[in-house]
């Protein structure tokens, strides 16, 4: 009896065994679909900012020095003026909460010097001297500044920084001189010279957060271009080229974060 049962079980297994793959084929393997990541909008301009500044210059950038006339007469004049402001625009980038940098293009209005002299009304015949001159100096600058923001306290962020770049100085001169006693001294000058030189800045200031994107910036900047050239007026016959310009700037600016 037991032998028959074992024989029947073996026979049933032999019959069902070929059917197993067929049955398995009726069931497809499960398909696993990865869940799509949540949509994250791309922030265009994140970290970038725009800026604009105006500055008051308490000292002269182009130092003309003293002017000397041949003698003191009524018909002589000398004037020297220099615009005491500086303006710049630029853009920058926040690398993190403490480091940032910006590139600024600036304009220095510069100075204007004029002189004139005519002693023909008082000098002996044949000895009169007539002379006049006009000098104009101004500059454009392109400076890359780097800053360290020293933390924010009640909305105020102090910072220090330094920069390096180029300055383009323009010097214009027109002058004439007539010596009735010796015509070999006569001359007429006219020049318009542009020159590029290295410049650097030292910066410090405070920024105040007005809104999420707008900051008011009150700062100090020392600007120097040791090799920049400009023209000066020393006398009716001397208009030398001098080297080196610098200034101290009290700056007021706005920064707009492009978040």
Regions found by a protein language model. Name each.
Residues 1-9:
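Bacterial N-terminal signal peptides that target proteins for export
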Residues 10-18:
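Bacterial N-terminal signal peptides
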Residues 23-52, 63, 259:
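Outer-membrane beta-barrel biogenesis signature
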Residues 44-90, 94, 100:
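Short, contiguous, helix-prone interaction/anchoring segments in small proteins
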Residues 47-49, 84-86, 139-143, 157, ...:
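Transmembrane beta-barrel architecture of outer-membrane proteins
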Residues 52-54, 89-93, 142-148, 162-166, ...:
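Residues on the lipid-exposed face of transmembrane beta-strands in outer-membrane beta-barrel proteins
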Residues 58-82, 107-141, 167-197, 225-249:
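Extracellular/periplasm-exposed beta-strand and loop segments of Gram-negative cell-envelope proteins
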Residues 98-101, 154-156, 208-216:
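Repeated loop/turn-to-beta-strand initiation elements of outer-membrane beta-barrel proteins
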